[in-house]
Amino acid sequence: INTFESNKEFVLNTLDISRFMRLRKEIKKYNPDYLYIPMIHLWNPIVNFMAKGAKIITTIHDITQHKGEESFIMDSLRKIVLKQSDKIIILSESLREKLVYQKVKSENIFVIPHANFTYYGENFDIEKKDYNNKRILFFGRINAYKGLDVLLEAMKIVVKENTDIKLSIVGNGDIKPYEEQIRELGNNIESNVRWIKDEEVEGFFMQSDFVVVPYIEASQSGVIPLSYSFGLPVIASKIGGIPEQVIDRETGYLVEPNNVVDLAEMILGLGSSESKRKELGKNAYTFAKEKLSWEGSAKLFDKLVKSI
């Protein structure tokens, strides 16, 4: 049953009562013992109500809205879903305390880390990975909390010492707040600000040497396991659940959020050592394969279901 791909479709489909009648019919036909919600959706309260008798398991990606994404509706929706859920899955241990503060019992909270994205590069060979592209990558939705402005300020320091390094900005979002910084950096910046198709993802990572995740707030980041899946080390902010994903000096480096100078130094350091990029990149790839496998996630999920 299709939900929506735009705000217009959401309004139209939400007002389409027949769609919910079909949904109710399907739920009644399956008569599920468990209902799994992989992410918060505006239809969740309705679906949860329809699945009376089923144990509800919900994955919560963020406890509060990020900077620039504040929404009273989403905050209220999250509170409703938390009350309806029997078990909550979080992607990092850092969120547990915040959920407990919102009256969720700790024994009903389970951590299942964000798994890898090796399926984006099924033919990827870590032994053939080129770490001499002289290009670093900022990947994903462009939002205020992701710290792109901090990275661009750091790049102003970086290019004074290493004019060969380029930053690729790849992802969908509003680039206007950063246009002046980008102009100042000239040819050291490459931008692909648009929706990136699945089949394009591999190319951007393959032509990069490492990834920077300069978030100023975060619960965790899906970009990190994605980067590891292509053998790329990550320089990331030491915030939220990110230190659970980036093992400092093993799979990348951690820096304090909003610290332009430290971020620039880390970029210059990693950017000047191909051997270090290769070492950390191989560690990251191994970490993704061994610690962030979908098989491992499935076992943890199975254990959770059996605990209800």
Name each region found by the language model.
Residues 179-202:
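Nucleotide-activated donor-binding/catalytic signature segment of Leloir-type glycosyltransferases, i.e.
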Residues 129-146, 152-155, 167-170:
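Conserved donor-binding/catalytic core segment of Leloir-type glycosyltransferases
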Residues 233-236, 246:
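Short hydrophobic beta-strand element within catalytic cores of glycosyltransferases
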Residues 248-249, 253-260, 269-274:
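Conserved acidic donor-binding segment of nucleotide-sugar-dependent glycosyltransferases
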Residues 69, 100-101, 110-133, 308:
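Acidic anion/phosphate-binding donor-loop and adjacent secondary structure
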Residues 262, 269, 276-291, 297-303:
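A short, well-ordered alpha-helix in the C-terminal region of glycosyltransferases
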Residues 19-23, 32-53:
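An aromatic- and histidine-rich active-site surface loop
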Residues 206-219, 232:
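Acidic donor-binding loop of glycosyltransferase active sites
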